[in-house]
Structures are given as structure tokens and as C-alpha cells.
């Protein structure tokens, strides 16, 4: 098996090394990841300048681009054909609305766009101590997916509590929860007195009840959320069609 590993925390992040080492027991692992932290990069792709790649002493490839750049580069000619893409282990949660901004999830999505099964895996906690737990779970999921293919346009978004493996209460298939709107921006001033702005903290949980990814984590379970790349809202078709029929367009 040939496995591509990427992330958004950067090629030197602890999570990616632990993940790659664990997956190496299943086959050949190639690591292609950003040269620095690119958290929040979402699905951005670099189109206005070339990408530069550096191979590190440990064999990993460092790219001066986004997580999506890394996977796109790897799967469209930079590497030999690959069987599966695993993105992570992210240092922090990717729950609910987080997936809209997550470079970790985006790297997995790019793998799926390019025809491969893909998993995004994140650790939930403030000072991550148990990356090995997520790495072992990722390995088991890769084994399962090698024999049981996911439907097209589907990835798995996996969140793991920062706990020793023997304290994990199980795995739950979940839906995305939601957060309230983000907190206001934070305004500060640079040494020259000019205003600068920081994006505010994410909003608190709004929908975090049973069945959500938030709830699974709170109860000590691994959350596994199947995400679909087709974002069409099919249930709205009839209502929207009726609404549009009321609009008169004249030349």
C-alpha cells in the first residue's frame, strides 16, 4: 500500500511524524506538507506563483504552499500513484463549522477530488499529549478502507479526544454540530501606532447535542463524520424553483 500523508500544521509538526511512523507499518508512506503552519487555509490553491519543494533529511517533502497545494502537487505528477490520503494529525479540533476553514480537512478533500479515499484526523485538546492514540485509530481506519471503499465524493473527518487509547470509550458515527457566530475581531496597535487586527475566537457551541461530533468528544468517544464533497442542497430544489417561477424576466 502507498500512503500520502499531509497536514496543515506544517511538515515539522509532531502529529505528522507520529502518524507517518504508525502508517509505515502498512506500506510505503510519503509525507508532503507545508513548510510552516497553514491552519485555516481551507481549500486554497496557489495559482499566481510557482511552488518550491525541499526534501528534508528525514525524506519528508516541504512545500511553500497550502495543504491543498501539497496534495495536489503530490497526486498530479510529483509522486508515483498513491492508494490513500491521510491528513493530520491536527493539533486541535476540527468539529462542526471548523471544517469550512480547516486545512487538515481540505487536504483530505483534495485527495478525494483526485480520486482517492481520504481521511482527516485531529486531536481535541489544548495541550496535546496522546498523538499515538489518533495514529493507531488512523491506522485501523486505513486498514478498513482498503477493504471497504467509501462512496465517491466522501471523506471521513475524524476527531479524537486527547486521551490514552485505553480510555477511549469507542467510535461514533456523527453529524457536524454548529457554533454560534465568531467573536468580534481584536484590535491592537503596532509599535508605530498603526492599527492591526486579529480574527476573534470561534463562537461557542450552538448545536452540540447527541449525535453531533461535539457530543461524541465530550463523552470520550472518537467522532467519525462522513463528509460529502457535493454541496448541492437538493431538498431546496422544489421550493427554489417555485420561487423563481414568480420572477418575470423580460428582454
UniProtKB/Swiss-Prot annotation:
Keywords: Cytoplasm, Hydrolase, Metal-binding, Nucleotide-binding. A divalent metal cation binds at residues 8-9, 39, 90. InterPro entries: SurE (IPR030048), SurE-like_Pase/nucleotidase (IPR002828), SurE-like_sf (IPR036523). It comes from the Bacteria. The keyword Disulfide bond does not apply. It is an enzyme of class 3 (hydrolase). It catalyses: a ribonucleoside 5'-phosphate + H2O = a ribonucleoside + phosphate. Its main location: cytoplasm. One of its GO terms (cellular component) is cytoplasm. GO terms for molecular function: 3'-nucleotidase activity; 5'-nucleotidase activity; exopolyphosphatase activity; metal ion binding; nucleotide binding. It is found in: Cytoplasm. Its EC number is 3.1.3.5. Its cofactor is a divalent metal cation. The keyword Chloroplast does not apply. It holds the Pfam family SurE. Binds 1 divalent metal cation per subunit. Nucleotidase that shows phosphatase activity on nucleoside 5'-monophosphates. Belongs to the SurE nucleotidase family. This is 5'-nucleotidase SurE. The gene is surE.
